[in-house]
Swiss-Prot record:
Heterodimer with IL12A; disulfide-linked. The heterodimer is known as interleukin IL-12. Heterodimer with IL23A; disulfide-linked. The heterodimer is known as interleukin IL-23. Also secreted as a monomer. Interacts with NBR1; this interaction promotes IL-12 secretion. Disulfide bonds join C50-C90. Keywords: Cytokine, Disulfide bond, Glycoprotein, Immunoglobulin domain, Secreted, Signal. InterPro entries: FN3_dom, FN3_sf, Hematopoietin_rcpt_L_F3_CS, Ig-like_dom, Ig-like_dom_sf, Ig-like_fold, Ig_sub2, IL-12. This is Interleukin-12 subunit beta. It is found in: Secreted. Glycans are attached at N125, N135, N223, N315. Belongs to the IL-12B family. PROSITE patterns: FN3 (PS50853), HEMATOPO_REC_L_F3 (PS01354), IG_LIKE (PS50835). GO terms for cellular component: extracellular space; membrane. Residues 1-22 form the signal peptide. The gene is IL12B. One of its GO terms (molecular function) is cytokine receptor activity. It comes from the Eukaryota.
Length: 327
């Protein structure tokens, strides 16, 4: 008896949930229709309702068709392909009453499409969004690549709204002036700055930050997700104020300072440094790793000294190199 009740309840949830999942509101008057992209799929039945108290003499038009596509307060569409997506508007007597925009999110062989963004080919898995933080303040930047140059819209937000998640607020996505070339093909680079709403830089991270990026291209919708701890995306800014002081012979003292952006106090948020002397005529560079902000080096004319930084206690990414000539 109990088994029968459980079976009936489970099927009821499935039958009720399936239609609700096929179409959902992305933002005001914009709806995403989830479509099975297999050739024999019937598509999704979508019913649009004109936002008006009027009942008669209502006609519907589409931005893909100059003629009326229907009449009455509701319009039923069988959405199967991109030709069925678009902007649908209801009118009466030449007056626009309301409109609805339909976007398609396609699933092929059980996999949601990822056509808009470039896979940045992480060795372990597909990576579409990459993020970096210059310190432990909870502020970080994410970026992505696309070969598409027009009709794009992006929105990055927290992937969860639950009380035990790490809430994040992201700004508007911006197009970088930098063009990225991969395998001889040029890509547009977009980025967004995000800030964790509540931060405690000295606390141990137990929950990852989760992000979802919603992408629109014309009438196509896709979403991409990523999750990480701030400690895993740390990349310090390079050291600043490099100075050389003569000692004896070719020996010199190289000194530098922590980057302004690095977390304080430095006694707690320590950096370690990689010092390298590069001589054009020698194949091997002289390298040393130090915890302090100075090092004794052998400097000769034509050589270049460079320094980069890394989190002292965690295996973060190294900063960019910053250099000074020996001469």
């Amino acid at each position: 008896m109990c088994h029968q009740k459980l079976t009936i309840s489970w099927f009821a949830v499935v039958l009720l949930a399936s239609p609700l999942m096929a179409i959902w509101e992305l933002e005001k008057d914009v709806y995403v229709v989830e479509v099975d992209w297999s050739p024999d799929a019937a598509g999704e039945r979508v019913v649009l309702t004109c936002d008006t108290s009027e009942e008669d003499d209502i006609i519907w038009t589409s931005d893909k068709n100059s003629e009326a596509v229907g009449s009455g307060k509701t319009l039923t569409i069988q959405v199967k392909e991109f030709s069925n997506a678009g902007q649908y508007t209801c009118h009466k007597g030449g007056k626009t009453l309301s409109h609805s925009r339909l976007l398609l999110h396609k699933k092929e062989n059980g996999i949601w499409s990822t056509d808009i963004l470039k896979d940045q080919k992480d060795p372990k898995n597909k990576t579409f969004l990459k993020c970096e933080a210059a310190n432990y303040s909870g502020r970080f930047t994410c970026w992505w690549l696309t070969a598409i140059s027009t009709d794009l819209k992006f929105n990055v937000k927290s992937s969860s709204s639950s009380s035990d998640s790490r809430a994040v607020t992201c700004g508007a996505a911006s197009l970088s002036a930098e063009k990225v070339t991969v395998d001889r093909k040029d890509y547009q680079k977009y980025s967004v700055a995000c800030q964790e709403d509540i931060t405690c830089p000295t606390a141990e991270e137990t929950l990852p930050i989760g992000l979802v990026m919603e992408a629109q291209h014309k009438y196509k919708y896709e979403n991409y997700s990523t999750g990480f701890f701030i400690r895993d995306i740390i990349k310090p800014d390079p050291p600043k104020n490099l100075q050389l002081k003569p000692l004896r012979g070719s020996q010199m003292e190289l000194s530098w300072e922590y980057p302004d952006s690095w977390s304080t106090p430095h006694s707690y948020f320590s950096l370690k440094f990689h010092v390298q002397v590069h001589r054009k005529r020698e194949r091997k560079d002289e390298s040393q790793f130090v915890d302090k902000t100075s090092a004794t080096i052998r400097c000769s004319k034509g050589a270049e000294v460079r320094v980069r930084a890394q989190d002292h206690y965690y295996n973060s990414s190294w900063s960019r190199w910053v250099s000074v000539p020996c001469s």
